[in-house]
Design a protein with these regions (language model features):
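TRNA-recognition modules of translation machinery and tRNA-sensing kinases, especially anticodon-binding
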Residues: 1-164
């Protein structure tokens, strides 16, 4: 169906697939919020400054979808708008940690197809992601990264999903 509407790389979920997709999104968001993350619903379009501030531009410009009339970019990941909420801000250490979670559809012009080069993954141009973002003191960054990986790993294990080299 996606091929008919937009071309390859744009999936359509229908019936039980759509229901499962929605349930998983809600499950991940609920797990994240019950672990102290605040849910946000960021925009899926960002300006050039936001894409540049997160390193998407100029490095990944060829992978991003650009809307010429408005000079906006479709987000490749929720981290782009979420981290830009705090761009050019001074955050008091007493306000840390900042723990956010968000669901967004994401858009990338990813090359590749199912096979060894992409470890058996189908590369999609549109896909859904639930993400966690933490803003912390720099000296805590490695410890926090380990905590975030453990949090996600725990959720996947609860679902009895095999882990792809985390």
């Amino acid at each position: 169906m996606g091929n008919k509407v937009t071309g390859s790389g744009f999936p359509v979920y229908k019936g039980k697939g759509a229901t499962l997709q929605r349930a998983l999104i809600n499950y991940f968001l609920d797990k994240n919020t019950s672990s102290g993350y605040t849910e946000v619903q960021p925009p899926v379009l960002v300006n050039e400054e936001s894409a540049f501030a997160t390193g998407q531009l100029p490095d990944k410009e060829g992978q991003m979808y650009h809307i010429n009339n408005d000079d906006l970019y479709l987000i490749p990941t929720a981290e782009v708008p979420i981290t830009n909420f705090y761009r050019n801000s001074i955050i008091n250490s007493s306000d840390l940690p900042i723990k956010l979670t968000g669901y967004t559809p994401c858009f990338r012009r990813e090359a590749g197809s199912y096979g060894k080069d992409v470890r058996g993954l189908n590369r999609l141009h549109q896909f859904d992601k639930v993400e966690i973002v933490r803003i912390e003191k720099p000296e805590n960054s490695y410890k926090v990264l380990d905590e975030m990986v453990a949090h996600v790993k725990n959720i996947l294990e609860e679902l009895e999903l095999s882990l792809i080299h985390i």
